[in-house]
UniProtKB/Swiss-Prot annotation:
It is found in: Cell inner membrane. Belongs to the UPF0161 family. One of its GO terms (cellular component) is plasma membrane. Its main location: membrane. It is a peripheral membrane protein. InterPro entries: Membr_insert_effic_factor_YidD (IPR002696). The keyword Transmembrane does not apply. Could be involved in insertion of integral membrane proteins into the membrane. This is Putative membrane protein insertion efficiency factor. Keywords: Cell inner membrane, Cell membrane, Membrane. It comes from Pseudomonas syringae pv. syringae (strain B728a).
Amino acid sequence: MRKLALVPIQFYRYAISPLMASHCRFYPSCSCYAYEAIENHGLLRGGWLSIRRLGRCHPWNPGGYDPVPAVPTSRSSSMAE
């Protein structure tokens, strides 16, 4: 399911985005952010992070560097070692 959700993002990045001027206020771009968020966090959490990011991408937001949050590590696996 995750791979299927990434297909439209890839299509946008390689077929549509090059035809438009760069308008994203953030680094990485919103499409890169969405791809990475879904790839790292899964469809639900990554999708939610992407929607929140798109909601912040507007002319009144200064933008800047906004990386995808790191995947939380499990405390139980680190304590088992």
